Amino acid sequence: MPLLDSFTVDHTRMNAPAVRVAKTMTTPKGDTITVFDLRFCVPNKEILSERGIHTLEHLFAGFMRDHLNSDRVEIIDISPMGCRTGFYMSLIGTPKEAEVAECWLAAMEDVLKVKQQSEIPELNEYQCGTYEMHSLEQAKEIAKNIIAAGVNVNRNDDLKLSDEILKGL
């Protein structure tokens, strides 16, 4: 099985909250797709709550689009990581990490403005696979923590696992 890009970086040295360009690729038509690692928690030390990350999934995707989409950037998808330490964001374009960090913080401010659970988009049995597994309170707590900490940048060159380590795993 091929080694995926996300497993070639040292998770023990990742900072959080932090933005990282996980991957870039060019489509056959010449568009650049960039995948960002939006790391909310330090891997293996912290984890996002189940209900909190699920509620953020519903809110964050729309709020990030409000702040980042433009004539040069279009978000394709924002999905939670299975390890519950962050989200992957795939988009068309090549925004700088600082711009993504700024938009991420603005999106977290938007989460804090949501007044009640009924304002969470697609919160019903028709549009959500586990519509009862939400917590606006937990999502707001996550947002507050991100805002308080600020968002840094993780660089692949700083996190790359050596060939020697990879061979030993």
Swiss-Prot record:
Reactions it catalyzes: S-(5-deoxy-D-ribos-5-yl)-L-homocysteine = (S)-4,5-dihydroxypentane-2,3-dione + L-homocysteine
This enzyme's EC code(s)? 4.4.1.21
Q: Keywords on this record? A: Autoinducer synthesis, Iron, Lyase, Metal-binding, Quorum sensing
The record's cofactor note says: Binds 1 Fe cation per subunit.
Top-level class of the enzyme under EC nomenclature: lyase
List positions binding Fe cation: H54, H58, C128
Q: Name one Pfam family in it.
A: LuxS
Instruction: Give yes or no: UniProt keyword Iron.
Output: yes
A GO BP entry is: quorum sensing
GO MF: iron ion binding; S-ribosylhomocysteine lyase activity
Task: Report the InterPro entries cross-referenced here.
Answer: LuxS_sf (IPR037005), Metalloenz_LuxS/M16 (IPR011249), S-ribosylhomocysteinase (IPR003815)
Please state which protein family the record places this protein in.
Belongs to the LuxS family.
What this chain does, per the record? Involved in the synthesis of autoinducer 2 (AI-2) which is secreted by bacteria and is used to communicate both the cell density and the metabolic potential of the environment. The regulation of gene expression in response to changes in cell density is called quorum sensing. Catalyzes the transformation of S-ribosylhomocysteine (RHC) to homocysteine (HC) and 4,5-dihydroxy-2,3-pentadione (DPD).
Oligomeric form and interacting partners: Homodimer.
Question: What is the protein name stated in its UniProt record?
Answer: S-ribosylhomocysteine lyase
Please report the organism this UniProt entry assigns to the protein: Shewanella loihica (strain ATCC BAA-1088 / PV-4)
